[in-house]
Amino acid sequence: MNFIINSPLEQFTTRVYFGLSSGLINLDTITLTSFSIYSIAVVALILGFSILNDNNTNILPTRWSLAFESLYFTVEKMVSEQIGGLEGRLLFPFMFSLFMYILIANVVSLVPYSYAINAQLIWTIGLSVAIWIGCTLTGLANHGAKFFGLFLPSGTNLPLVPVLVIIELLSYIARALSLGLRLGSNILAGHLLLVILAGLILNFISISIFTFALGILPLSILLGIVALESAIAFIQAIVFTILTCSYIKDAIHLH
């Protein structure tokens, strides 16, 4: 196992730390990678956050409780407005878990030299494709052939039907990629910007004492970008969850 990081860009590289092998059975596919380690860490942080939120023995809520409840009610309002009804209540645990996983993974990746889970496009696109397939199967199971009416807006003139059906169909298929691509590309671009700027600033302040003193200005700019990336981490989790709710709503209510 090699835990030494030689380059900041290695936060985007999936590394294998441990693997099982046997002369009788091929176990090479059973490996412990940086992706799995950070995924376990993210889940552990979510569970720890939930435990800290346990406010049953306190009269006044703690800061952790207020923060967790704010996130909880934000997602609950989102699901009730987008989906609503019994379906919304049944799907809320999934939507809240999805939101928390993306949010915590984004925040963890802001730690210098940490692994950026959501910068892996194969993961984010794979997640969005799985959600898209689930929404499509839900729509077909609930509505049968009527589900295809989603591709034909009501009141469409007959000559425009073929064109609009093709456009709506392509737009629907693009959801499978756009949902994950939006998340992955935003996280990847933001982290690359931080890595490049941090490297340039480090080289600049290492030249002399004079440049070290001048480095206060670019360092303040870098801190501002870090704050911006922190906001983007939250916004991307919100956007991913809202769009997932919207896709599920289309599958359930056909509008």
UniProtKB/Swiss-Prot annotation:
| Coiled-coil region(s) | none
Tell me what topology the record assigns in the membrane.
Multi-pass membrane protein
Asked if tRNA processing is a keyword of the record, the answer is: no
Q: Which GO terms describe its biological process?
A: proton motive force-driven ATP synthesis
Q: Which residues cross the membrane?
A: 32-52, 91-111, 121-141, 159-200, 219-251
GO MF terms listed in the record are: proton transmembrane transporter activity
Arranged from A to Z, the UniProt key words for this protein are:
ATP synthesis, CF(0), Hydrogen ion transport, Ion transport, Membrane, Mitochondrion, Mitochondrion inner membrane, Transmembrane, Transmembrane helix, Transport
Q: What does this protein do?
A: Mitochondrial membrane ATP synthase (F(1)F(0) ATP synthase or Complex V) produces ATP from ADP in the presence of a proton gradient across the membrane which is generated by electron transport complexes of the respiratory chain. F-type ATP synthases consist of two structural domains, F(1) - containing the extramembraneous catalytic core, and F(0) - containing the membrane proton channel, linked together by a central stalk and a peripheral stalk.
Q: Do you know which PANTHER family this protein is assigned to?
A: ATP SYNTHASE SUBUNIT A
The family this protein is said to belong to: Belongs to the ATPase A chain family.
Q: What is this protein called?
A: ATP synthase subunit a
- Give the originating organism: Yarrowia lipolytica (strain CLIB 122 / E 150)
